[in-house]
C-alpha cells in the first residue's frame, strides 16, 4: 500500500491502546500539528485510524472582571450606597447615591442598567429606590467572579453567559483530537506501507519543467482546523443606517444634515412646543453650560414663532396664552430629536427656500436623558423624514410607511392615534417583534399643524415622522435588548457574527 510520507509517519507513531493527541504526534514526527491533523483525517477516511474529538471550555476573568471581583459589582455597590442613603424607605436623588458608591465613567451606566434587572430597586425620574428584601450577598454573578478568582470552575452556564456579555469573562473553547490505530491500520503496517512524496502546491517551476505531470499532488483537507479571525466590520447599526439611506433615496428623498447642538428655538419653539412643556425641563435634556445660549436668532422668524405661541395661527387661531421668553429659546442643548433639522430646512435656513413638492430625510443621532432599559438609551438614531405637497392626508402617510418598511420585509404595521404639540392628526407606529410576537413602538408621525408651518412661511401640507433605527433593527434581526448592539453592555459576539443582509 502506498501512502504519503506524513500519513505513514502518523501510522508508525499511533497506538492501538493509547490515544495520541495531535500535538504529541507532531512532536514525535517533526511535522507541524496542522499537517498531522490533515494526515490523520485522511487516514480516518481510509479506516486506518480513529480520530476522536473532545471540546474543553475555559472561562477566564478579564481585567474588568478581576477589578469587580475585588471591588464589587457596580450594581451591588450602588445598592449598598442606596441603603445607606435610606432609599429602602423613600426614593433618594440618584446623583448623590452614585457619588457615595464611588462610581464614575462607564461604571455608572453599568450600575444603573443592572440595578433594576437584578431587582435591587427602581429608578424613576432621577430618583432611586432600594428593595430592602434584595440579597446582594448571594448575587450569582458576584459569586461566580469570586469562584473564578479562586481558580475553580463555574457550572451555571447562564451566569457565565451573562458575565461574558458584560465582558467580565472570556469563554474559549478548544477542540482536542486524539488518534488511535485501528485493526485495519495494524494489518496494513504488517503488510508493509510504502511512503510516497506528495506535492502540496503547483509552482511555476513545475509548470515550466513539465514535472507536474509526473508528481502526485496532495488532497486539500477542507475539514482541517483553521485560525479564527475576527476582522473589523461595519457595525450592524451603521449597516442598517446605510440601507435606510439607500431605500429613502430610492423613494425620491433628499438627505439633510444639521447641528447636533442647537438652540431650543429650533429644537422646540419652532415646533410649537410650549416653553412649559415637561420635556423641556433639565431632567429630560442635555443642556450646555459653556456656551449656554446662542448669540443670534432670525428676528423675523422669532417674531412669527412668538406670535404663534401667544395667538395661534390664522383668523381663528388660539395659542397657549402663556409667556414666551426669547432668552429661554436661545438656550443651547443636544437635540432631543432630529426634527430640529426639519424646522431649519422648512424655514429655508439650511438650504434654499423649499417649495412643493419636496421630500427630505436624515438618519442622525438624537440625545435624551432617558432611563436606560431594554428599549431606551441616552443617545439613539432617529430616521427623520417629511414630505411637502398639496392636499396630503393620513392615508398618504400610512402608505409611505408601508412602502418603506416593506423594503425590510416588515409588513405587520399597526397605527395608534396620539397627541403631539406640532402635528394634528398624529399617530404612533407599532411593529411586531419576530421573536416575542409583541408589538413594539417604532415611531411617531403626523401632519404638521398650521401653528408650526405658518411662522416658517411654508405653503402646503407637510407630513412628517421620526422613526427609531434601533427598533427597526430589532424587527430585522430579532434581538430584544437595545443595549446588545451599542453601549457599554453590547454583545460583542452578536456584533462579530451578525449576518450582513442587504
Swiss-Prot record:
- Binding of Mg(2+) occurs at 424
Q: Which InterPro entries match?
A: aa-tRNA-synth_II (IPR006195), aa-tRNA-synth_II/BPL/LPL (IPR045864), Phe-tRNA-synth_IIc_asu (IPR004529), Phe_tRNA_ligase_alpha_bac/arc (IPR022917), Phenylalanyl-tRNA_Synthase (IPR002319), WH-like_DNA-bd_sf (IPR036388)
Where found, per UniProt? Cytoplasm
Q: Name one GO cellular component term.
A: cytoplasm
Instruction: Give the principal location in a single coarse category.
Output: cytoplasm
Enzyme nomenclature, EC number: 6.1.1.20
Q: What does the record give as cofactor?
A: Mg(2+)
Q: Which domain of life is it from?
A: Archaea
Does Glycoprotein appear among the keywords? no
User: Which biological process, per GO, is one annotated for this protein?
Assistant: phenylalanyl-tRNA aminoacylation
In the record, what terms sit under GO molecular function? ATP binding; magnesium ion binding; phenylalanine-tRNA ligase activity; tRNA binding
Subunit notes for this chain? Tetramer of two alpha and two beta subunits.
| Protein family according to the UniProt entry | Belongs to the class-II aminoacyl-tRNA synthetase family. Phe-tRNA synthetase alpha subunit type 2 subfamily.
Could you identify this protein by its name?
Answer: Phenylalanine--tRNA ligase alpha subunit
Name of the gene: pheS
Amino acid at each position: 500500500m502506498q501512502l504519503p510520507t506524513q500519513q505513514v509517519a502518523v501510522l508508525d507513531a499511533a497506538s492501538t491502546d493509547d490515544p495520541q493527541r495531535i500535538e504529541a504526534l507532531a512532536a514525535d514526527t517533526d511535522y507541524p500539528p496542522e499537517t498531522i491533523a490533515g494526515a490523520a483525517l485522511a487516514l480516518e477516511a481510509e479506516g486506518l485510524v480513529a480520530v476522536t474529538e473532545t471540546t474543553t471550555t475555559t472561562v477566564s476573568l478579564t481585567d474588568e472582571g478581576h477589578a469587580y471581583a475585588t471591588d464589587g459589582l457596580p450594581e451591588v455597590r450602588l445598592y449598598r450606597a442606596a441603603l445607606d442613603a435610606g432609599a429602602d424607605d423613600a426614593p433618594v436623588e440618584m446623583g448623590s447615591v452614585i457619588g457615595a458608591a464611588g462610581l464614575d465613567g462607564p461604571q455608572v451606566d453599568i450600575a444603573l442598567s443592572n440595578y433594576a434587572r437584578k431587582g435591587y430597586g427602581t429608578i424613576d425620574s432621577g430618583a432611586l429606590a432600594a428593595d430592602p428584601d434584595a440579597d446582594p450577598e448571594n448575587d450569582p454573578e458576584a459569586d461566580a467572579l469570586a469562584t473564578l478568582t479562586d481558580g475553580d470552575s463555574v457550572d451555571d452556564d447562564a451566569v457565565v453567559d451573562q458575565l461574558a456579555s458584560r465582558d467580565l469573562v472570556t469563554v474559549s473553547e478548544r477542540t482536542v483530537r486524539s488518534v488511535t490505530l485501528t485493526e485495519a491500520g495494524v494489518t496494513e503496517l504488517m503488510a508493509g506501507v510504502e511512503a510516497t512524496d506528495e506535492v502540496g502546491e503547483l509552482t511555476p517551476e513545475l509548470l515550466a519543467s513539465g514535472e507536474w505531470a509526473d508528481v502526485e499532488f496532495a488532497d486539500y483537507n477542507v475539514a482541517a482546523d483553521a485560525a479564527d479571525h475576527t476582522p473589523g466590520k461595519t457595525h450592524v447599526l451603521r449597516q442598517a443606517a446605510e440601507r435606510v439611506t439607500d431605500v429613502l433615496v430610492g423613494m425620491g428623498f433628499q438627505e439633510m444634515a444639521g447641528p447636533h447642538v442647537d438652540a431650543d428655538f429650533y429644537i422646540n419653539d419652532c415646533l410649537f412646543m410650549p416653553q412649559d412643556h415637561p420635556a423641556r425641563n433639565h431632567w429630560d435634556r442635555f443642556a450646555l453650560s459653556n456656551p449656554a445660549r446662542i448669540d443670534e436668532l432670525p428676528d423675523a422668524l422669532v417674531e412669527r414663532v412668538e406670535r404663534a405661541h401667544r395667538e395661534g395661527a390664522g383668523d381663528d387661531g388660539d395659542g397657549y396664552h402663556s409667556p414666551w421668553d426669547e432668552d429661554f429659546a436661545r438656550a443651547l442643548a443636544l437635540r432631543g430629536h432630529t426634527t430640529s433639522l426639519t424646522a431649519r430646512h422648512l424655514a429655508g435656513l439650511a438650504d434654499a427656500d423649499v417649495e412643493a413638492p419636496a421630500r427630505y430625510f436624515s438618519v442622525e443621532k438624537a440625545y435624551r436623558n432617558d432611563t436606560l432599559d431594554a428599549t431606551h438609551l441616552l443617545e439613539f438614531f432617529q430616521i427623520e423624514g417629511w414630505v411637502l405637497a398639496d392636499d396630503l392626508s393620513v392615508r398618504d402617510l400610512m402608505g409611505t410607511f408601508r412602502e418603506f418598511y416593506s423594503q425590510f420585509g416588515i409588513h405587520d404595521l399597526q397605527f395608534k392615534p396620539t397627541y403631539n404639540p406640532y402635528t394634528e392628526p398624529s399617530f404612533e407606529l407599532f411593529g411586531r417583534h419576530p421573536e416575542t410576537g409583541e408589538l413594539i413602538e417604532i415611531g411617531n408621525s403626523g401632519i404638521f399643524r398650521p401653528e408650526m408651518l405658518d411662522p416658517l412661511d411654508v405653503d402646503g401640507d407637510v407630513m412628517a415622522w421620526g422613526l427609531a433605527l434601533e427598533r427597526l433593527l430589532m424587527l430585522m434581526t430579532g434581538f430584544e435588548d437595545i443595549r446588545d448592539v451599542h453601549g457599554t453592555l453590547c454583545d460583542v459576539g452578536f456584533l462579530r457574527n451578525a449576518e450582513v443582509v442587504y
